[in-house]
């Protein structure tokens, strides 16, 4: 399909310049046939460079990394730690915040980090606004409160996955299991397993809902493979899990445990 589209684009461009190309070809043939071969080769190289510049510019325009999650998951403190390296008291936000993040990968790359409110009345509205520009989504989970919030987390994540799969260029997705400094925090492995179970139940419920009542009716009918228990590995987009702690193991004065998150951001930049 891609080669056919390329041929159509090339045919259209060639048609527009055909009289000029014919005239140039005749003049070159009269002077020296070798010049014709050189001119054709140069033209092919030029068109290739223009094509790849267009493709790269589209990719480069997707520089946003969206931080999403339930209220009190710690995503705003993660956002602040990445940008400043410092601890700061945060409160539940009602507006989005964005800032340029310099990626530490020795290539001078940067990303735009966008912290989206976790309040239920705002989260989907703002996600819709920014998702088309997202290179990646960081879904932050409160590992200490996960056991009692698992259903709410799964419902939010379900919609994030559905929205991401519906995009032409699906973003990378990271599940950041935050607050690992708390003794009762669940591991990333356990969180992944429980989310797979909850999402498996959710997709059955959503697929059985009447289309007129299902807000995601224009998206794929279900996640994963039909007839099989849901696993993140079945999705067309890559989903990764890691453990982190925005607060750190020594309280407010300690350094954050976000090295794995920083490495992941450098990888997708």
From Swiss-Prot:
Membrane recorded as keyword: yes
Main location: endoplasmic reticulum
Membrane topology: Single-pass membrane protein
Gene3D superfamilies linked: P-loop containing nucleotide triphosphate hydrolases
Listed Pfam families: SRPRB (PF09439)
Residues modified as Phosphothreonine: 212
Segments traversing the membrane: 35-55
Subcellular location: Endoplasmic reticulum membrane
This protein's UniProt keywords: Endoplasmic reticulum, GTP-binding, Membrane, Nucleotide-binding, Phosphoprotein, Receptor, Transmembrane, Transmembrane helix
Positions where Phosphoserine occurs in the chain: 110
GO biological process: SRP-dependent cotranslational protein targeting to membrane, signal sequence recognition
An example molecular function term from Gene Ontology annotations: GTP binding
Coiled coil: none
Disulfide bond sites: none
Example of a GO cellular component annotation carried by this entry: cytoplasmic microtubule
Binding site for GTP: 69-77, 90-93, 118, 178-181, 246
Keyword Membrane: yes
Subunit (UniProt): Heterodimer with SRPRA.
Function recorded in the entry: Component of the SRP (signal recognition particle) receptor. Ensures, in conjunction with the signal recognition particle, the correct targeting of the nascent secretory proteins to the endoplasmic reticulum membrane system. May mediate the membrane association of SR.
Stored PANTHER family: ADP-RIBOSYLATION FACTOR-RELATED PROTEIN 1
Sequence similarity: Belongs to the SRP receptor beta subunit family.
Protein name: Signal recognition particle receptor subunit beta
Organism (species): Mus musculus
């Amino acid at each position: 399909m891609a080669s056919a589209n390329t041929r159509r684009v090339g045919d259209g461009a060639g048609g527009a310049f055909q009289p000029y190309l014919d005239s140039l070809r005749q003049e070159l043939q009269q002077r020296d046939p070798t010049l014709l071969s050189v001119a054709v080769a140069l033209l092919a190289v030029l068109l290739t460079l223009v094509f790849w510049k267009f493709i790269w510019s589209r990719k480069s325009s997707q520089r946003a990394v969206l931080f999403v999650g339930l209220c009190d998951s710690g995503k705003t403190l993660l956002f602040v730690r990445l940008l400043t390296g410092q601890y700061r008291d945060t409160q539940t936000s009602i507006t989005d915040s964005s800032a340029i993040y310099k990626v530490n990968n020795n290539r001078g790359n940067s990303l735009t980090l966008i912290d989206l409110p976790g309040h239920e009345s705002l989260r989907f509205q703002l996600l819709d606004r920014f998702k088309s520009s997202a290179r990646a989504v960081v879904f932050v989970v409160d590992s200490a409160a996960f056991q009692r919030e698992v259903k709410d987390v799964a419902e939010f994540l379900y919609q994030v996955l559905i929205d991401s799969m519906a995009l032409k260029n699906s973003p990378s997705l990271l599940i950041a299991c935050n607050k690992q400094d708390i003794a009762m925090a669940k591991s990333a492995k356990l969180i992944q397993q429980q989310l797979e179970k909850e999402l498996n139940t959710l997709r059955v419920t959503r697929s059985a809902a009447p289309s007129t009542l299902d807000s995601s009716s224009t998206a794929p009918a279900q996640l994963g493979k039909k007839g099989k228990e849901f696993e993140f590995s079945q999705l067309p987009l890559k989903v990764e899990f890691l453990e982190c702690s925005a607060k750190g193991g020594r309280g407010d004065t300690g350094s954050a445990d976000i090295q794995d998150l920083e490495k992941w951001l450098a990888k997708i930049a």
